[in-house]
């Protein structure tokens, strides 16, 4: 490229384990070990791959670097909001007309992403909730989605930007089923290193599955909250919390739906509805 600087680049494919999204588990995997997070410190910038200082960044972050170098930091910051500059990739899925990947300025409101860029809901449907930043981020109610999609604003409403993966749910969606699917995913992806995550997340998944199938107990919502309390803050990496935080929010915000499953002994929403979107 005419820079006078040369380097060797290797593209090393992974096996798809979710836990390897954690930086030190990724390093362990690249070293040929099982993908399990390390205790920190030391942080990768001090002691990372094969003991050397290592920078670990997402591809999305690295893709911004050439534009910042070519056009300057001020230009990049001008694209977003005051404390969160640049653009962000928002992947919108769920019950919307136009699911897809949208690159938008940081600070674009969640309402605009769902109803303007992704086209809103199917005719006659009502919004029930939106997960703003991927499966690990707490759900937001319809009255909360006027929030700007940036790190600080979402933190103020009790959620996170995360990966920017927006999941939209309308009034056909069973929130107990949502919680059960999330918990089953995290139970499968746990590396098993930490007891609260290894034991607590599958237990949570089992409780949610029996609620979904009509075998729930009256104290299951409280038991789920207790499990969340015991998982959060007690693991080496955030994977256990990534399950506990969204489940806690779903139980808190849709408590009556969980109780209805217990009371009626079945899922009142019936089978999973087919996907709907405009092609």
Regions found by a protein language model. Name each.
Residues 16-19, 132, 136-141, 229-238:
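Short, surface-exposed loop/turn segments at secondary-structure boundaries that line and modulate
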Residues 1-106, 118:
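Hydrophobic alpha-helical positions that pack around
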Residues 29-41, 143-160:
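Active-site loop ensemble at the mouth of alpha/beta enzyme cores that anchors a bound cofactor
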Residues 7-9, 122-156, 252:
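Terminal amphipathic helices with adjacent charged low-complexity linkers/tails
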Residues 1-3, 148-279:
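Ferredoxin-type iron-sulfur electron-transfer modules in oxidoreductases and energy-metabolism complexes
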Residues 106-123:
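Short amphipathic, charge-patterned alpha-helical segments
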Residues 22-24, 105, 136-147, 208-209, ...:
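Short glycine/threonine-rich loop-to-helix capping motif typified by GTGT followed
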Residues 40-67, 126, 131, 135, ...:
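Short, conserved aromatic-histidine micro-motifs
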């Amino acid at each position: 490229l005419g820079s006078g600087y040369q380097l060797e680049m290797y593209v090393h494919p992974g096996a798809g384990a979710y836990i390897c999204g954690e930086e030190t588990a990724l390093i362990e995997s690249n070293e040929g070990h099982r993908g399990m997070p390390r205790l920190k410190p030391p942080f990768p910038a001090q002691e990372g791959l094969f003991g050397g200082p290592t920078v670990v960044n997402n591809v999305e972050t690295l893709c911004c670097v050439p534009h910042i170098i070519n056009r300057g930091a001020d230009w990049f910051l001008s694209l977003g909001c005051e404390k969160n500059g640049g653009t962000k990739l928002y992947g919108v899925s769920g019950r919307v007309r136009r699911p897809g990947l949208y690159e938008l300025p940081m600070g674009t409101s969640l309402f605009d992403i769902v109803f303007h860029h992704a086209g809103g809901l199917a005719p006659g449907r009502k919004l029930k909730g939106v997960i703003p930043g991927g499966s690990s981020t707490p759900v937001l109610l319809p009255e909360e989605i006027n929030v700007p999609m940036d790190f600080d604003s979402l933190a103020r409403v009790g959620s996170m930007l995360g990966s920017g993966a927006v999941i939209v749910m309308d009034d056909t969606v069973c929130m107990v089923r949502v919680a059960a699917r999330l918990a089953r995913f995290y139970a499968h992806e746990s590396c098993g290193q930490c007891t609260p995550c290894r034991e607590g997340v599958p237990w949570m998944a089992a409780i949610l599955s029996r609620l979904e199938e009509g075998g729930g107990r009256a104290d299951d919502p409280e038991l789920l909250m207790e499990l969340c309390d015991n998982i959060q803050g007690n693991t080496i990496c955030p994977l256990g919390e990534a399950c506990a935080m969204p489940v806690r929010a779903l139980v808190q915000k849709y408590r009556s739906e969980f109780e209805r499953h217990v009371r009626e002994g079945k899922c009142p929403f019936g089978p999973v509805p087919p996907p709907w979107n405009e092609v």
